[in-house]
């Protein structure tokens, strides 16, 4: 099995081949490692290698009896160096501070444990901007990640390393997280499927409702079916997680792909928040997609939520976000200090992180509460837009 052959296989195909014995986990992992070693000098998508441990885990997977094999058995994957930790493995979160201290995590997140329990073999951890705060992956701690489609461009962020690895064919599944676009933006930049799941669908423990519940975790893949498979593995409640984690799943997400899809009512718009502009090619792609959906028998109408057209209201929303965001960043830097056991100085974090941390200290409690309530209101208004007509889907450009 070569890395090129592996890159032609989606996750479902790899798992099926490992299950029927036509491919071993060792072969798949070796091919993924070879692929990573071939592309990473140009992409800089890998920040922590687990190659030797992954080889040992793959050998153990091949020796496991059929009764002990999970839905991702033997599958090589990568995980983002943020939005989750692996006990005994380095964790930097894109931060010079944790890198300088050589910090090693002491706990495995529920999300990563579910990957492991399902049989996945984590071969590496991937590049991310410091604390996932910006939509491109260019941390000063390890340097910028590059887009496999064009090395002069960014894969986006904050899950840029995972997106670059999956897009380059190193692995079929890459873990990712999203608060303000960190799954969706890299997926768009790299031509992947990127689903930000509903809030509280995938548990975030040991993080408790990061960013006030705006952060959701899943991954990036090359197919809708692989994303459904990953959601089957990661979604669902846990005794240590938030009590709000949803439990209303009757069937597998993957199995539901084979079910009937009746005509849907779909709203579409090429408007962007605050009255901004988008590239004409992107606008045309959205319009063409709407036409294709109409040709497929769906009821497709052009309709735009007010937040995308009311510039004054959008400005208010941005104000809410900046107030809440700066407080959350201040808390995140405090959490860095708790992990490292040393004060975080101005030179330990990037300039924008330090500035946001300082701004967070100037936001009074009543304004923070107002900001969080305002952001929750935006979510409720989005739901109201869908339910009023009703619409099943809102089709937009990627934020």
Annotated model-derived regions:
Residues 147-159, 200-207, 326-343:
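Short, basic, helix/turn surface patches
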Residues 87, 135-138, 142-144, 163-269, ...:
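Fold-level recognition of mixed alpha/beta catalytic cores in primary-metabolism enzymes, strongest
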Residues 1-67, 233-399:
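Amidase signature
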Residues 108, 192, 283-287:
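Amphipathic alpha-helical segments in well-structured domains
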Residues 67, 102-104, 152-156, 184, ...:
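Short Gly/Pro-enriched turn/cap motifs at secondary-structure boundaries
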Residues 155-174, 214, 218-221, 336-359:
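Electropositive, surface-exposed helix/loop patches at the edges of structured domains
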Residues 92-94, 124-125, 211-212, 267-271, ...:
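Short beta-strands and strand-loop turn motifs
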Residues 2-179, 291, 386-388:
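Gly/Ser-rich catalytic/binding loops embedded in alpha/beta enzyme cores
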């Amino acid at each position: 099995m070569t890395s090129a052959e592996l890159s032609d296989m989606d996750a479902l195909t790899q798992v099926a081949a490992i299950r029927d014995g036509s491919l071993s986990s060792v072969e798949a992992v070796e091919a993924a490692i070879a692929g990573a070693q071939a592309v990473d000098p140009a992409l800089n998508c890998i920040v922590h290698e687990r190659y030797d441990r992954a080889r040992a885990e793959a050998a153990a997977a091949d020796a496991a009896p059929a009764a002990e094999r999970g839905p991702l058995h033997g599958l090589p994957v990568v995980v983002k160096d943020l939005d989750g930790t692996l006990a005994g493995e380095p964790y930097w979160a894109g931060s010079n501070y944790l890198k300088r201290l050589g910090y090693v995590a002491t706990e495995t997140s529920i999300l990563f444990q579910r990957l492991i329990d399902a049989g996945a073999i984590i071969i590496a951890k991937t590049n991310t901007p410091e604390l996932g705060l910006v939509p491109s992956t260019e941390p000063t701690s390890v340097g910028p990640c590059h887009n496999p489609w064009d090395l002069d461009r960014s894969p986006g962020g904050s899950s840029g390393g995972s997106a670059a690895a999956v897009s380059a064919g190193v692995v079929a599944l890459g873990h990712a997280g999203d608060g303000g676009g960190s799954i969706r933006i890299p997926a768009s930049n790299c031509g992947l499927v990127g689903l930000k799941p509903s809030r509280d669908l995938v548990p975030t423990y040991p993080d408790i409702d990061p960013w006030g519940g705006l952060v959701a975790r899943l991954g990036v893949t090359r197919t809708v079916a692989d994303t459904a498979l990953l959601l089957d593995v990661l979604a669902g409640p846990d005794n240590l997680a938030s009590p709000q984690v949803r439990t209303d799943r009757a069937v597998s997400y993957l199995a539901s792909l084979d079910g009937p899809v009746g005509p849907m009512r779909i709203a579409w718009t090429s408007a962007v928040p605050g009255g901004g502009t988008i590239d004409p090619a992107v606008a045309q792609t959205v319009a063409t997609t709407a036409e294709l959906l109409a040709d497929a028998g769906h009821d497709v109408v052009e309709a735009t939520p007010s937040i995308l057209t009311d510039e004054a209201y959008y400005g208010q929303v941005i104000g809410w976000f900046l107030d809440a965001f700066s407080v959350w960043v201040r808390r995140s830097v405090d959490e860095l200090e708790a992990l490292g056991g040393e004060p975080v100085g101005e030179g330990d974090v990037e300039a924008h992180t330090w500035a946001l941390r300082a701004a967070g200290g100037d936001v009074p409690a009543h304004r923070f509460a107002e900001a969080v309530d305002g952001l929750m209101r935006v979510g409720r208004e989005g739901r109201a837009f869908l339910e009023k007509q009703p619409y099943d889907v809102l089709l937009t450009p990627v934020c």
